[in-house]
């Protein structure tokens, strides 16, 4: 009997529960930052062939080194071209691949 009582006394004390974390002071809700303005770009989207205006150098963003022709309405019977007729691709072997002031390829 006394031995069992001694064993109970020798047992480690039960672990204390962790301390409660300090309560955070109430904070004001952070205000949402102002939405970013839409990117200013003179390039059209992929739906229009990715052709850029002369203000951005006349390069075609989707054609890779292409140039913009004069902005006219694409004709419907130009079905054999994959991109908009407003955009022409400069061949890599065709010199510097620059664009004329009119937007045509050099």
UniProtKB/Swiss-Prot annotation:
Bias (Pro residues) ranges: 11-25
Bias type Low complexity, positions: 1-10
BP term (GO), one: keratinization
Region of interest called Disordered, as start-end residue ranges on this chain: 1-25
Reported tissue expression: Skin-specific. Expression was readily detected in adult trunk skin, adult arm skin, fetal skin, penal skin, vulva, esophagus and tongue. Not expressed in the cervix, rectum, lung, colon, or placenta.
InterPro entries: LCE
Factors inducing expression: By calcium and UVB.
Swiss-Prot/TrEMBL keywords: Keratinization
Residues making up the signal peptide according to the UniProt record: none
Complex and partners: Interacts with CYSRT1.
Family: Belongs to the LCE family.
Additional remarks: Belongs to the LCE cluster present on 1q21.
Function field: Precursors of the cornified envelope of the stratum corneum.
Protein name per Swiss-Prot or TrEMBL: Late cornified envelope protein 2A
Organism: Homo sapiens
Lineage of the species this protein comes from: Eukaryota, Metazoa, Chordata, Craniata, Vertebrata
Gene coding for it: LCE2A
């Amino acid at each position: 009997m006394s031995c069992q009582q001694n064993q109970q006394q020798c047992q480690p004390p039960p672990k204390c529960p962790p301390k409660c974390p300090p309560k955070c002071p109430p904070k004001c809700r952070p205000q949402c930052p102002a939405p970013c303005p839409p990117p200013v770009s003179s390039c059209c989207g992929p739906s229009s062939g990715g052709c850029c205006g002369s203000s951005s150098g006349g390069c075609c963003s989707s054609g890779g080194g292409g140039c913009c022709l004069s902005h006219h309405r694409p004709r419907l019977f130009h079905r054999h071209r994959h991109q908009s007729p407003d955009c022409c691709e400069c061949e890599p072997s065709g010199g510097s691949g620059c664009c004329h002031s009119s937007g045509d390829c050099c």
